[in-house]
Amino acid sequence: MNQSVTRPRPDAKALGKVGVLYGGRSAERDVSLMSGKGVHQALLSAGVDAHLFDTGERTLAELAAAGFDRVFIALHGRYGEDGTLQGALELLGLPYTGSGPMASSLSMDKIMTKRVWLQHGLRTPAFEVLDAQAELRTVPDRLGLPLILKPPHEGSTVGITKVAGYSDMKEGYAQAAKFDDEVLAEQFIAGRELTVAVLGTGAAAHALPVIEIVAPGGNYDYEHKYFSDETQYFCPADLPDAVAAEVADLAVRAYRALGCAGWGRIDFMLDADNRPWLLEANTSPGMTSHSLVPMAAKAIGMSYAELCVSIVSEAACKVHSPARNS
């Protein structure tokens, strides 16, 4: 798990004019602003001609006219991570980092992600999809308590509630329903919280060292993700070699099952029997000072700047039109 990733060092000048797309209009805008600024500074330090572009304040027409040769997507959540932007970039013929429209859309939808994983025989907690007509009082009878309620299309723990008792179901549902028409109710897996960064595409996709996250009181919420210095991270995680290998292998299989490309992150819970359970996929992970992908890269000797350059060097359009008859 600790072997270095060996790849040729990209020529910064050959990358051309790079746009760092950040900000946006999702509930994760503030995180994206931090990610984008970090990526921008890292690319500049590596000699890349990089420019910030806030998709929440500027138009698609302005993006098309900006003269970028490629873009680094440092957006999180809706409109930036859900396939919407990726489809627009395909139409513009502008190479971009990360997954294509389909994989981005699937991965952003936690319900569809779990359905794909189950179809591939990959372990993920039991779940139900709730709407306004759902009989909330009966859900714990099937999924057990505690359970998790979350909006299917948000990240960074936005709108998530850990429901401890029947009386908490209504409030937890209302919190998640602020963000989505449907709510994902998920079996709670007690254990250790793990995450695995994956770099590459297809057969070349490979896992970086497993990270364990230990938040105060087990509460890895928005504050503890991005601002708290109390959260502890262990990279590589202190796991038996066989368990670490299983988690890394499952991360790559989960990533490939969704058709992810370029880079991403897969989140897990590890139960008391050392069985990993897939939680969700992130196709545009955070790149802040507290973020996990840079931490995993550092563990194999890859600096933050090297990581950013490596990711943007693989920017590409993912939808290929069939050849036209002349």
UniProtKB/Swiss-Prot annotation:
Q: Which amino acid positions bind Mg(2+) 1, per UniProt? A: 267, 280
Provide GO CC annotations from the record: cytosol
Details of cofactor binding: Binds 2 magnesium or manganese ions per subunit.
Q: Which residues form the ATP-grasp domain?
A: 114-313
Q: Which GO terms describe its molecular function?
A: ATP binding; D-alanine-D-alanine ligase activity; metal ion binding
Q: Which cofactor does it need?
A: Mg(2+); Mn(2+)
Per its UniProt record, what PROSITE patterns does this chain match? ATP_GRASP (PS50975), DALA_DALA_LIGASE_1 (PS00843), DALA_DALA_LIGASE_2 (PS00844)
Reactions the enzyme catalyzes: 2 D-alanine + ATP = D-alanyl-D-alanine + ADP + phosphate + H(+)
**Residues reported to bind Mg(2+) 2:** 280, 282
Q: What class of enzyme is it?
A: ligase
Q: In which pathway does it act?
A: Cell wall biogenesis; peptidoglycan biosynthesis
Q: Which Pfam families match?
A: Dala_Dala_lig_C (PF07478), Dala_Dala_lig_N (PF01820)
Q: Which family does it belong to?
A: Belongs to the D-alanine--D-alanine ligase family.
User: NCBIfam families of this UniProt entry?
Assistant: D_ala_D_alaTIGR, PRK01372.1
Its protein name is: D-alanine--D-alanine ligase
